[in-house]
Amino acid sequence: MLARGLPLRSALVKACPPLLNTGREGWGHHRVGTGEGAGISTRTPRPYSEIPSPGDNGWINLYHFWRKKSSQRIHFRHIENFQKYGPIYREKLGNLESVYIIHPEDVAHLFKFEGSYPQRYDIPPWLAYHQYYQKPIGVLFKKSGAWKKDRVVLNTEVMAPEAIKNFIPLLNPVSQDFVSLLRKRIQQQGSGKFAGDIKEDLFHFAFESITNVMFGERLGMLEDTVNTEAQKFIDAVYKMFHTSVPLLNLPPELYRLFRTKTWRDHVAAWDTIFNKAEKYTEIFYQDLRQKTEFRNYPGILYHLLKSEKMLLEDVKANITEMLAGGVDTTSMTLQWHLYEMARSLNVQEMLREEVLNARRQAEGDISKMLQMVPLLKASIKETLRLHPISVTLQRYPESDLVLQDYLIPAKTLVQVAIYAMGRDPAFFSNPDKFDPTRWLGKDKDLIHFRNLGFGWGVRQCVGRRIAELEMTLFLIHILENFKIEMQQIGDVNTIFNLILTPDKPIFLVFRPFNQDPPQA
């Protein structure tokens, strides 16, 4: 929208020492059956007030939260709290109170109560910026019928299988150009390999990809000279995420009132995002109006305008949100995926073998290849299990429900701790191991309501299909052309910057696998 972040069991224990005797079942909560209705009791539910909690004084809780410097390690804090309180707990920080759950069956039950218009938690500083500066909003912030109206239109243009097929010829050349970029770096280093941190290159790749899908035009982000205006947009998205965390726990009005530097930086980042997105949209909008025929798919913007199912202001708002959400999220997941493959060379070879076999069987047809790489697609799920973009998935249930024998009132903020779930041995065997095959087993109970990296249901990530296609194509071309290794042996942990990011640079080595790149 992020070890692996706790790379080894020893690192997990070091970061989160066991608070209860976990025995064989995980972190202090009992393992519950995974059949239909598991964990849902017919007994009279206990009241909400009895849900385990560190205390009801949100300001004292917030003081301890800050004292322990928990802001950037909130995902570890979730693990600690589940160790201490069991599979459900509530916590109040400042004015915000949430119920946290971890069990997949509880998640499945929660989603039955999300209603026709599911609501997620709105990031306070984001919402405050949009409201105070009267910025147009898209599906990220819209509610009820207004959200549904936009979402139905976007689903047709962004999520439908027919639409996804149109994106392949736009995204595939970007991945091929990234391979060319790495080959050029290998030549420049003159050692037969390239070693370094490619985080910025992945940002460029992700922005080049999402803008090509949106506008049907390339910006040239992978060329020798990077577009300076586009770089400003990328930098602004990065700053927007990183300035969000310090603004989460107090009312944004306070930061605005005192004009704190963090708030000013946050506003400046959003201003740049809106200004650049508006400029791009207007340029391509005017260009599209002058054309009557297109040799290739002209992009999502054109189809949204052509359908006339959205007002122009709504089109611009949703394009802005998809552009902002399509840079750090995708690039960070790809960085983690490369990291995992570099640490698990046997898995990397399995993935490469599948890709090469698919290339031969499909005779170079990339569309056919995409249907023949189930392990590679599973590896993306596995990366998101270990390194989810978001640490929680949130819902406000439409009516009262019972979870773990506790009554949860309607409109209570319930957060699914997906990072903690992904690290729990009660739900994933050998949870620290990068094992894509776990997603391909025949026992569906083993993956039931566990694949939540893109959210779930009608309010899942609107850019999910674009991101999945973009990452799959990228990994196909990388695996065909390079062997990936770690430059330095060592674990990389995670920090919470609204999305989960590495706590230090990831240095990788790319060695040519073939001298001649495969033909598309």
UniProtKB/Swiss-Prot annotation:
Belongs to the cytochrome P450 family. A cytochrome P450 monooxygenase that catalyzes the side-chain hydroxylation and cleavage of cholesterol to pregnenolone, the precursor of most steroid hormones. Catalyzes three sequential oxidation reactions of cholesterol, namely the hydroxylation at C22 followed with the hydroxylation at C20 to yield 20R,22R-hydroxycholesterol that is further cleaved between C20 and C22 to yield the C21-steroid pregnenolone and 4-methylpentanal. Mechanistically, uses molecular oxygen inserting one oxygen atom into a substrate and reducing the second into a water molecule. One of its GO terms (molecular function) is cholesterol monooxygenase (side-chain-cleaving) activity. Interacts with FDX1/adrenodoxin. It comes from the Eukaryota. Pfam families: p450. The keyword Lipid metabolism applies. This is Cholesterol side-chain cleavage enzyme, mitochondrial. It catalyses: 6 reduced [adrenodoxin] + cholesterol + 3 O2 + 6 H(+) = 4-methylpentanal + pregnenolone + 6 oxidized [adrenodoxin] + 4 H2O; 2 reduced [adrenodoxin] + cholesterol + O2 + 2 H(+) = (22R)-hydroxycholesterol + 2 oxidized [adrenodoxin] + H2O; (22R)-hydroxycholesterol + 2 reduced [adrenodoxin] + O2 + 2 H(+) = (20R,22R)-20,22-dihydroxycholesterol + 2 oxidized [adrenodoxin] + H2O; (20R,22R)-20,22-dihydroxycholesterol + 2 reduced [adrenodoxin] + O2 + 2 H(+) = 4-methylpentanal + pregnenolone + 2 oxidized [adrenodoxin] + 2 H2O. Residues 27-48 are annotated as: Disordered. InterPro entries: CYP11_CYP27_families, Cyt_P450, Cyt_P450_CS, Cyt_P450_E_grp-I, Cyt_P450_sf. Pathway: Lipid metabolism; C21-steroid hormone metabolism; Steroid metabolism; cholesterol metabolism. Keywords: Cholesterol metabolism, Heme, Iron, Lipid metabolism, Membrane, Metal-binding, Mitochondrion, Mitochondrion inner membrane, Monooxygenase, Oxidoreductase, Steroid metabolism, Steroidogenesis, Sterol metabolism, Transit peptide. Residues 1-39 form a transit peptide. It is an enzyme of class 1 (oxidoreductase). One of its GO terms (cellular component) is mitochondrial inner membrane. Its EC number is 1.14.15.6. It comes from Capra hircus. The lineage of its organism: Eukaryota, Metazoa, Chordata, Craniata, Vertebrata. PANTHER family: CHOLESTEROL SIDE-CHAIN CLEAVAGE ENZYME, MITOCHONDRIAL (PTHR24279:SF3), CYTOCHROME P450 (PTHR24279). The gene is CYP11A1. One of its GO terms (biological process) is glucocorticoid biosynthetic process. Heme binds at residue 461. It is found in: Mitochondrion inner membrane. Coiled coil: none annotated.
